[in-house]
Amino acid sequence: MNIPTHYRALYRTWLRFAIVMMMVGLLAGLSFEESAKRAPVSDLLPAGKHLEAVLPLALVHGHAFLIGALLPLALVFMLHLGLSMGFRPIGEKTLRWATWLYLPGSALSVALMLYKGYHWVLGVRFGHTDFAAWDAAFFGGNHALRAAVYGVAHTAMSAGLAVLAVAFWRGMGKQAGD
C-alpha cells in the first residue's frame, strides 16, 4: 500500500504520543496507589471523605490511557483503514491542525488531572479536610484562570477530534483520485 508521507509523519507522531501516554498512565496508577496509602481512612478522614479526596488522582490512570493512548491508536488505525479502503487521503494541513490541537489538548487535560489529584491528596495529607475551602484554593484561588485553562485544554482536544472526524467523513464518500 502506498502511504502518503504526511500520513507516515502523523502515524509516527501519534504512536510516539500514545507510547508516552501509556507510560504516564502506568506511572499515574503507581503514584495513585502510593499516594493513597499516605492518606489513610481515619477519624479525621472517614471513608466517604477519603474517597472524595483520592478520586481525582485515581481517575488520571484511566484517562491517560483513554485519551492519551487508546484514542490516538484508534484514530491512527481509522486513518490507515480509510487508506486501505480507497478513501481519499486527508490533506497534510488538516492532519497538522488535528495533531496540533488534539495532542497538546489531551496532554494538558491529563496534566490538569494530575495537578488536581495531587492538590487534593496532598491537602488531605497536610490536614486540610474542609473540601469547599480547599477547592476554592485550587489554582491559587483564581477561578478565572482555572476556567480558562480547563477551557483551553478541552476545547483544543475537542477541536482536534472534530477536525479529524469531519475530514475523515468527507473523505469516506470519495475514492482516492476523485
Segment roles from a protein language model:
Residues 1-178:
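Hydrophobic alpha-helical transmembrane segments of multi-pass integral membrane proteins
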